[in-house]
Amino acid sequence: MVKVMVVAEVRPSEDVNKVLSAISNFFDFEKMNTRKEGIIDILVLEARTLKSLLKFHRVLRNERILDSARKYLMKGIEGNTIAFMIHKQAAAVGVLSFVDSDKESPLGAIKFYIEYQNPKEIVDWLAPKTAHGVPLWDNPVPPDV
């Protein structure tokens, strides 16, 4: 079973539609929930298919950041989950920039969680190893089982 979840804070100075637009540059969600934590709204977006990450897959290649993406994705594997964060302001202008901590994105990072039976298979699809910047393989989207 596949579950892709994206979590982002919407602070009082931010427009929820702009945060949704930033996320939508990389992720096609099926379901959205919002909860309140003090004065901050928390967006929780979900999808049950890896095809929801096709934009993310394409951007990794267009921006030529497969090697750094692979490093962040591999580092984020724990059990059957991959967790990583991207810079919210960069995402708002369509640029993918990974961050190590929430503090690196002043308005909070966008957090991705991908649950899958074999997380390494997802990493190999999204960000394959490269030689001189060229992917060594181009795997199809793993099946949503």
From Swiss-Prot:
Pfam family, one: RNA_binding
InterPro entries reported in the protein's UniProt record: PAB1135-like (IPR002739), Ribosomal_uL5_dom_sf (IPR022803)
Domain of life (superkingdom): Archaea
NCBIfam families according to UniProt: PRK00447.1
Family membership noted in the UniProt record: Belongs to the UPF0201 family.
PANTHER family per UniProt: UPF0201 PROTEIN TK1335
Name of the protein this chain belongs to: UPF0201 protein SSO1042
